[in-house]
Amino acid sequence: MTGNLRTFILMAALTALVMGMGGLIGGRGGAVIALAIAGAGNLFAWWNSDKMVLRQQGAHLVTRQQAPELVDMVAALAQRANLPMPKVYVLETEQPNAFATGRNPENAAVAVTQGIMRVLNRDELAGVIAHELAHIKHRDTLTMTVTATMAGAIAMLGNMLMFSSMFGGRDDNRGSGLAAILAMIFAPMAAGLVQMAISRTREYEADRMGAEICGRPMALAGALAKISRAAGQVVNIPAERNPASASMFIVNPLHALRMDRLFATHPPTEERIARLQAMASGAPASGPWGAR
């Protein structure tokens, strides 16, 4: 199953959960209203999420005059990826990490930390930036915004269902009391699992395309190894304050976080590196980035 097909199926599952929760609360009309509420939330998040996350992370915009090597690298890789030049931001944290945001390729941004520019060499940093550009090209920033909003809507509907059950609910509600209780408990959990599964799928796809953009799969593999080792040793305070943003980063930024794979926002780093190593045996047609 391709990554895009898997994402489509998981998104369909989230939509079904939203409508199912709405249906338990208010029948067919409730399902439609729940979907409309989720749609309105998605529209708001689509327009504002990039500004919100950049502000939460304390990112500041940099120009070519301030960071010529970084901005030139982003420009060269964006050209290889056939993308408009994104805005470039720097985060004032020593944890090596990076993320992309923006509602579409024309309004996108790439953010890197101070730490990543110190820890990685030139080719490794190019691999990370190429990974983030792959997210932009795939419109993963939009996908993850939608999934986060829908997961939040399901949690809200779960609370509404709890109060509806407590105070009697509708007489013609086709869901039994037991079904309502089970949905109230398990639907938000299922939504979270689906959200995390989508996040992991998009990371694999971004690794693959990022390696194609930069032309150096082993450079990206080396970057992932270095970032993963350092992420558990250096605290990223803005990310710790906003843990919902963890899935945006190339490696989970939360300090000393060990979770079951089912609940992980990112695939195991070892598996990501193994896939990149398998790619390294075939040279991209475009050749490696930065080759002279």
Curated annotation (Swiss-Prot):
Membrane topology, as annotated: Multi-pass membrane protein
GO molecular function annotation: metalloendopeptidase activity; zinc ion binding
Subcellular location: Cell inner membrane
Transmembrane segments: 7-27, 29-49, 148-168, 178-198
Keywords (A to Z) from UniProt: Cell inner membrane, Cell membrane, Hydrolase, Membrane, Metal-binding, Metalloprotease, Protease, Transmembrane, Transmembrane helix, Zinc
GO cellular component, as recorded: plasma membrane
Cofactor note: Binds 1 zinc ion per subunit.
BP GO terms, sorted: proteolysis
One Pfam family recorded for the sequence: Peptidase_M48
Domain of life (superkingdom): Bacteria
Active site (record annotation): E132
HAMAP family linked to this entry: Pept_M48_protease_HtpX
Family (UniProt): Belongs to the peptidase M48B family.
NCBIfam families given in the database record: PRK01345.1, PRK03001.1
Record's protein name: Protease HtpX homolog
Gene from which the chain derives: htpX
